[in-house]
Regions:
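Soluble, non-membrane globular domain cores that form compact, hydrophobic packing
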Residues: 2-104, 110-197
């Protein structure tokens, strides 16, 4: 074999090796763990909420689960913290029938191809933990599994328990976003021991 043929063969082998490495990196390195969740409708999200509660061993308040009207952007924002819902297919929320309890579990299904982790982060950053006015949610968790996002906010113990139930059912989740809220400080004239006029 002459020198030119040997060089061509070496170049071809090098190119094949580089292509094989790139295929390996993209095929296996970027693969996310598969979600156990298959959601094709708002009813599927409602059923998932029921399954989440089945895995919760602590006492829960009396709750009402509802599918949100996707044309009512203000209501969707109230429950999700999302200003833009163009990439959202369904939203189902579960909250107490008596609104003096700071508790909310919201499941969101985003459209195929949407970065659900980014939406989960936006929800965690923008959800109003004081939306009930007289009470505040102490802890907020959000995470995506496939194209389903879970947001739960309430006291720390309940939030952890409900969120763990979601993660167990999902099988795998992306980035977990967590936020802790402090109780607002009362004005001095409202502190205990102050005279009220």
């Amino acid at each position: 074999m002459n020198k030119t043929v040997k060089i061509i063969i070496a170049v071809v082998i090098a190119i094949v090796a580089v292509v094989a490495i790139l295929v390996g990196v993209f095929a296996f390195g970027n693969s996310k763990p598969k979600s156990n969740l298959t959601i094709n409708s708002a009813e599927d999200l409602t059923a998932l909420i029921d399954q989440i509660y089945s895995g919760v061993s602590i006492e829960m308040p009396m709750l009402m689960t509802q599918e949100l009207d996707m044309t009512d952007t203000e209501t969707v924002k109230y429950f999700t913290g999302l200003e833009n819902i163009d990439n959202v297919e369904y939203v189902v929320a579960s909250e107490p029938m008596m609104t003096s309890q700071a508790y909310s579990l919201v499941l969101v299904k985003v459209k195929d191809g949407v970065n659900a982790d980014a939406v989960a982060k936006t929800m965690n950053e923008n959800i109003n933990t004081r939306k009930w006015i007289c009470v505040t949610a102490e802890k907020v968790y959000t995470a995506a599994s496939g194209n389903v996002i879970c947001l739960v906010m309430t006291n720390t113990e309940t939030a952890q328990t409900v969120f763990e139930s979601f993660k167990t059912l999902a099988g795998s989740v992306g980035e977990v976003y967590e936020r802790t809220e402090e109780e607002p400080e009362l004005p001095e004239d409202m502190l205990p021991g102050q005279e009220v006029y």
